C-alpha cells in the first residue's frame, strides 16, 4: 500500500509519517530525503541546492518527478511532502492531509529551528504563498483543494500520539475491497 502524508510546514507530517511507517513496517520517504539526495547528486549541500532552487525551477521539478517515480514504482511506503498526495496521484492508496493554524505551526517551527515565533510566522506565511503560486504555475495544482484527500486532520487539536493514533486507525480501517473509489486527481500537469 502507498500512503501519502501532505501538509504545510510545521503541520507534523514528518513526525506522523515516520511513526506510521514504523508501526506498519513500511519505508518512510520524505521530500526532505529526496531533496538531500538531489543535492548529493549535484555535489551540493542541501542549503546550497535550496539557494539554487530559488532561481532554478527545474530543481523543484526534479524533486517532484522523483516523488512521482517513487509512487509509480514502489509499494509499502509512506511518502511524505507538501505535494505527496498530488504527485502520487492515482498511485496512492490512501492520501492524508495534516494541517494546523499558522500560529501553531509558527511556534513549532520556531522551537525546531531556534528562532523567534514572529520570524517563523512571517517566513512560514511567505513560504506558503510562494509555494502556492509555484504549484499553480508548474502543475495547475491548487494546494488549498483538499478534495483529493481521504483524511484531513487539524494536528493542533491532538497530541502527536493522538494524531498518529487517528491516522493509524484510519489506515488500518481501509480495506481495498470496500473501496468504492477515490477522488481522482484531475487537471494536474505532470511536466517535469
Curated annotation (Swiss-Prot):
- Which InterPro entries does the entry link to? Cyt_kin_arch, Cytidylate_kinase_dom, P-loop_NTPase
Which key words tag this protein in UniProt? Answer: ATP-binding, Cytoplasm, Kinase, Nucleotide-binding, Transferase
Provide the E.C. number(s) assigned to this enzyme: 2.7.4.25
Which top-rank group of organisms is this from? Archaea
- A single MF term (Gene Ontology): dCMP kinase activity
State the Gene3D superfamilies in the record: P-loop containing nucleotide triphosphate hydrolases
Which residue spans traverse the membrane? none
Residue positions annotated to bind ATP are 7-15
Question: Hey, which family's this protein in?
Answer: Belongs to the cytidylate kinase family. Type 2 subfamily.
**Name used for this protein in its record:** Cytidylate kinase
Q: Which organism is it from?
A: Natronomonas pharaonis (strain ATCC 35678 / DSM 2160 / CIP 103997 / JCM 8858 / NBRC 14720 / NCIMB 2260 / Gabara)
Please state the gene responsible for encoding this protein: cmk
Amino acid at each position: 500500500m502507498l500512503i501519502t502524508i501532505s501538509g504545510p510546514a510545521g503541520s507534523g507530517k514528518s513526525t506522523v509519517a515516520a511513526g506510521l511507517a514504523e508501526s506498519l513496517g513500511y519505508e518512510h520517504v520524505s521530500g526532505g530525503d529526496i531533496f538531500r539526495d538531489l543535492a548529493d547528486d549535484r555535489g551540493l549541500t542541501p542549503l546550497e541546492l535550496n539557494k539554487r532552487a530559488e532561481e532554478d525551477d527545474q530543481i523543484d521539478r526534479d524533486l517532484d518527478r522523483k516523488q512521482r517515480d517513487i509512487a509509480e514504482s514502489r509499494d509499502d511506503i509512506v511518502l511524505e511532502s507538501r505535494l505527496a498526495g498530488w504527485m502520487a496521484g492515482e498511485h496512492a492508496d490512501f492520501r492524508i492531509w495534516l494541517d494546523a493554524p499558522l500560529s501553531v505551526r509558527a511556534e513549532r517551527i520556531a522551537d525546531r529551528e531556534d528562532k523567534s515565533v514572529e520570524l517563523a510566522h512571517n517566513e512560514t506565511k511567505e513560504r506558503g504563498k510562494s509555494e502556492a503560486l509555484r504549484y499553480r504555475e508548474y502543475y495547475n495544482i491548487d494546494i488549498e483543494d483538499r478534495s483529493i484527500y481521504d483524511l484531513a486532520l487539524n494536528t493542533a487539536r491532538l497530541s502527536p500520539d493522538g494524531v498518529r493514533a487517528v491516522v493509524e486507525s484510519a489506515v488500518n480501517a481501509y480495506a481495498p475491497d470496500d473501496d468504492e473509489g477515490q477522488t481522482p486527481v484531475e487537471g494536474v500537469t505532470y511536466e517535469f
